Curated annotation (Swiss-Prot):
UniProt keyword list: Cell inner membrane, Cell membrane, Magnesium, Membrane, Transferase, Transmembrane, Transmembrane helix, Ubiquinone biosynthesis
Upper lineage: Bacteria, Pseudomonadati, Pseudomonadota, Gammaproteobacteria, Enterobacterales
Primary localization class, coarse: membrane
Enzyme class, UniProt record, top EC level: transferase
TM regions (residue ranges): 23-43, 46-66, 98-118, 141-161, 163-183, 213-233, 234-254, 268-288
Protein name (record): 4-hydroxybenzoate octaprenyltransferase
Functional summary from the UniProt entry: Catalyzes the prenylation of para-hydroxybenzoate (PHB) with an all-trans polyprenyl group. Mediates the second step in the final reaction sequence of ubiquinone-8 (UQ-8) biosynthesis, which is the condensation of the polyisoprenoid side chain with PHB, generating the first membrane-bound Q intermediate 3-octaprenyl-4-hydroxybenzoate.
Alphabetical list of Pfam families matching this protein: UbiA
Species this protein is from: Yersinia pseudotuberculosis serotype O:1b (strain IP 31758)
Required cofactor names: Mg(2+)
InterPro entries tied to this protein: HB_polyprenyltransferase-like, Prenyltransferase, UbiA_prenyltransferase, UbiA_prenylTrfase_CS, UbiA_sf
């Protein structure tokens, strides 16, 4: 019985950290890899690569924990989130706070192996991870904060590799924010009815009937910014082909969200993993 209880608890911790749902980690990983390869104009130093990849998974897990802690009193009223560990009582509030601290300490321990510029930038990453879950209570634009949080590994990556923050770094961050707002609006469309009922704010609610158009414009902005980055970095044809393929995926996503149905909107959100992967492959091949 004791072994069964331990197993159940472990499963609950894994669910709290979304280990069973890696899509968030992947959407955080791709822009991190974009930045590391662009900053180093090719394969980055092995130590830096390992630190950032591990950091992605630790910080994403920490972000999920603080998100669920912030939403612990409302998740029980949303069909998709009612069974999460905190609202269901499988994990206590104290246990979630301890887990968050452990994950942050692990992440900061990794950052301490890098240069001082990266260490200072990591403090902003922590602040963004902490405040994002609470933004949906005060603004209809929490997705913009999420974009900054998911993209903050970009200036950190440039700082770690080159100890500089060039124009390309900020263009890449802006592209990632546009992309994140687009795909997280798709995600928010899944919960829009529940969010309206319980008073949670999101871009899906703010954009209303213009949601598909604005998502399309954000996707276009992402692609145009990527073209500018390719030109500034003198990337090869493979990168521009990857932009075209990403555009094709965005077009496919528009078809999926056309009727604003929950399941297709969620599939459109998941499809963004391939966008990030394809753009990374374009950068990778350009420096081959």
């Amino acid at each position: 019985m004791k072994g069964s209880t331990v197993h159940t608890k472990w499963q609950a911790y894994c669910r709290l950290m979304r280990i069973d749902k890696p899509i968030g980690s992947l959407l955080l990983l791709w822009p991190t890899l974009w930045a590391l390869w662009l900053a180093g104009r090719g394969i980055p130093e092995a130590k830096i690569l390992v630190v950032f990849v591990l950091g992605v998974f630790f910080m994403r897990a920490a972000g999920c924990v603080v998100n669920d802690y912030a939403d612990r009193h409302i998740d029980g009223f949303v069909k998709r989130t009612a069974s999460r560990p905190l609202p269901s009582g499988t994990i206590s509030e104290k246990e979630s706070k301890i887990l968050f601290v452990v994950l942050i300490l692990l992440s900061f321990g990794l950052v301490l192996t890098l240069n001082s510029m990266t260490i200072w930038l990591s403090l902003a990453a922590l602040a963004l991870a902490w405040i994002y879950p609470f933004m949906k209570r005060v603004t209809h634009l929490p997705q913009v904060v999420l974009g900054a949080a998911f993209g903050w590994s970009i200036p950190m990556g440039f700082a770690a590799v080159s100890e500089s923050l060039p124009l390309v770094c900020w263009l890449l961050l802006l592209a990632n924010i546009c992309w994140t707002v687009a795909y997280d609006t798709q995600y928010a469309m899944v919960d829009r009815d529940d969010d309206l009922r319980i008073g949670v704010k999101s871009t899906a609610i703010l954009f209303g009937q213009h949601d598909k158009l604005i998502i399309g414009l954000l996707q276009l902005a992402t692609l145009l910014l990527m073209v500018a980055i390719g030109w500034l970095m003198n990337l090869g044809g493979a990168f521009y082909w990857s932009i075209l393929l990403a555009g094709a995926l965005f077009t496919h996503q528009q078809k999926m969200i056309a009727q604003r149905e929950r399941e297709p909107c969620f599939r459109a959100f998941l499809n963004n993993n391939y966008v990030g992967l394809i753009l990374f492959l374009g950068i990778l091949i350009s420096y081959w």
